[in-house]
C-alpha cells in the first residue's frame, strides 16, 4: 500500500487521548522506526517505564518478523519479544502521503528512534533538521553500527561483527580455542540500552531548555564501553586479556566445577567465603595452607588449587553439595 488505509486524523485523536499518568514516562510518545533488536530494545525498555511507543514499519515489515528467528506459533519469537507493549503502524515513508502522515505524528510526539545507516534519514527527508522544523521539542535518536564518521560508517553492522571487531570475542570462550561470541546478542542489546539512556538524558535536558536535541550512538561505541576494565588493562599497561572460560582473571576460585551429575559455580572472592568453602569441603588444611591463604595467593597458585577442588566436587551430586552450602 502507498500509505495507511485508515483516517490519520482519527488516529491522532486516539493517540492524543491515550495517556495514563501512572508511570515515570507517562505522556511521552515515541515513534520507533527501528528494526530487529538494536533499534527496538531501547523502545521496549522505555515502554516499560510508561512511554507510549508506536512502532512504524515499512509495507514490507520489520526484518525481525522472519518466522525462522526463534519461531513461535508461526510467528517470530524475536519480533514478539522486542515489540511487546507497543502500538503498531505501517507507513510508506517513500510516498508523499506516507511522509505527511509521519510528519503529522512528529508534531505530537516527543522522540523518534531509528537504526538506519548514515544518509538514509536525509534521503527520506526525516533527518533532525527536517523534523525540528515541525516540532522544535522533538528528540531524534539514531543507533548505527559504527557511527556517522570514519571508514566503517557505511558498513552494515551485525551483532557478531561488532562483538568481533570490538575485541569481545577475543576474550570470550575457552583458552586455546577459537573465538566465541557471547550467548546473547550483546552488541544489539547494548545499542538498545545505550539508546534508552541517551533518550532519557535528552528528555531531562529538554525539561531545562525547552527544546529537543539529536542523540547519536553506535553499537561499536557501546561495546567498547562495556569492555570496561578489560579495555583499561590494554590501554594502561598493554596487558592483552585472554579468554578464561568461566574462570576469573583476578579471583580464585571463580568458575564452574563438574559435580557427579552436573555443574557447580563457585565464586569465593572474599577470604571469608574461601574459609566457608573449605569448611563445606571438609578440607580445613586448605584454608590454612599458605599457598591459598589470600585471594592473591590463590591466583598465583591457581594451577595447583583448581585441580584439588575439581577432585573434590566430582565426588558428589549437585543436590548433595547444595545442601551443605
Language model features: what each stretch is:
Residues 62-64, 235-241:
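Short Pro/Gly-enriched beta-strand edge/turn motifs at strand-loop
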